[in-house]
Swiss-Prot record:
Heme binds at H237. GO terms for biological process: L-tryptophan catabolic process to acetyl-CoA; L-tryptophan catabolic process to kynurenine. Its cofactor is heme. Heme-dependent dioxygenase that catalyzes the oxidative cleavage of the L-tryptophan (L-Trp) pyrrole ring and converts L-tryptophan to N-formyl-L-kynurenine. Catalyzes the oxidative cleavage of the indole moiety. It holds the Pfam family Trp_dioxygenase. Homotetramer. Pathway: Amino-acid degradation; L-tryptophan degradation via kynurenine pathway; L-kynurenine from L-tryptophan: step 1/2. Coiled coil: none annotated. It comes from the Bacteria. It is an enzyme of class 1 (oxidoreductase). The gene is kynA. Keywords: Dioxygenase, Heme, Iron, Metal-binding, Oxidoreductase, Tryptophan catabolism. This is Tryptophan 2,3-dioxygenase. The keyword GTP-binding does not apply.
Amino acid sequence: MSNAPYDPATEGARMNFKGRMSYGDYLMLDRLLDAQAPLSSAHDELLFIIQHQTSELWMKLAIHEIKAAMAAIAKDDVQPAFKMLARVSRIFEQLNGAWDVLRTMTPSEYTLFRDKLGESSGFQSFQYRSIEFLLGNRNLAMLRPHAHHPELTAELEAILAKPSLYDEALKLLARRGFFIGADGQRTDWRGTRSESPEVAAAWTSVYRDPQRHWELYELAEKLVDFEDYFRRWRFNHVTTVERIIGFKTGTGGTSGVNYLRKMLEIVLFPELWKLRTGL
């Protein structure tokens, strides 16, 4: 047995990348790893930055998958949407795990750099707002934090001009022969829709005969799966913030924990949750 160090080149691995695309080139790691610029000497500021930057990367993928799922549902090509929505659920499972890393930072450690954040706050996240709007939580007041970036406002307005993910699911429900009341005549998508007894009755019919309406049933369960993970993400956000800053005002001027708790009251797909009581 040779004691020489293992050399991957002996098995054909390329070791010289001059003039060729390497792993770092493909992922543009020089730019990615140069994007962390702490404003203080505090040890934990790098953790804070990376936590939020990686969350934004995962949200970028979530938006990609949600939009693709919506397009598939709109074309009655429902099966691929199942995979996409399952992936979004896994993304939020990953994001939930990230809170555990941030929670290793104590209140004392956070105070060492909090003043460097200025008025920046997570509720100003363009991608998070995009996800909320795509899912149907369309609070138009939340356009205002992006008004200083007209191009971002235009992208959010473009999302508001089209049906949400749940709207696309309801349109599919109607195309499959179910009566969905006023939701069937909607043409203005900008606001948050109201809960509907007709929609609840339609989904209840699906759940009472899942074999007959398997695609609709599976789609509904994928939506519930996703909202379940999304709720956990919101809850973990609340508890992490309370653990680190208590009930202080948020850096963006919100009421901090109290603001985040209000978000826990929002239900994205209300009929899919309420129908369970009557089955």
